[in-house]
Curated annotation (Swiss-Prot):
Part of the 30S ribosomal subunit. Forms a tight heterodimer with protein bS6. This is Small ribosomal subunit protein bS18. Pfam families: Ribosomal_S18. Keywords: Ribonucleoprotein, Ribosomal protein, RNA-binding, rRNA-binding. Belongs to the bacterial ribosomal protein bS18 family. The gene is rpsR. GO terms for cellular component: ribonucleoprotein complex; ribosome. The keyword DNA-binding does not apply. Transmembrane segments: none annotated. Coiled coil: none annotated. One of its GO terms (molecular function) is small ribosomal subunit rRNA binding. Gene3D superfamilies: Ribosomal protein S18. GO terms for biological process: translation.
Length: 73
């Protein structure tokens, strides 16, 4: 099993209210550079927090706060 990076260990004490589509900097920590959502194993979040975070990512993409993909080639 791959080790969880140190940054995600710090995020475990977040409340579910902290995940908000307007908090782009926080949500982008749980996304790959390509724009995909990281897995629970990589983020270290609970199932409930992971679902909330994924929902907020979808909102951000719909509102064009983050792109759907990194680049079109």
């Amino acid at each position: 099993m791959a080790p969880v990076d140190v940054e995600s260990q710090v995020e475990l004490d977040l409340k579910i209210e902290d995940f908000d589509y307007k908090n782009v900097a926080l949500i982008k920590r749980f996304m790959t550079p390509v724009g995909r959502v990281l897995s629970r194993r990589a983020t270290g979040l609970s199932a409930k927090k992971q679902r909330k975070m994924a929902k907020e990512v979808r909102k951000m993409k719909f509102l064009a706060l983050v792109p759907y993909c990194d680049r079109h080639k």
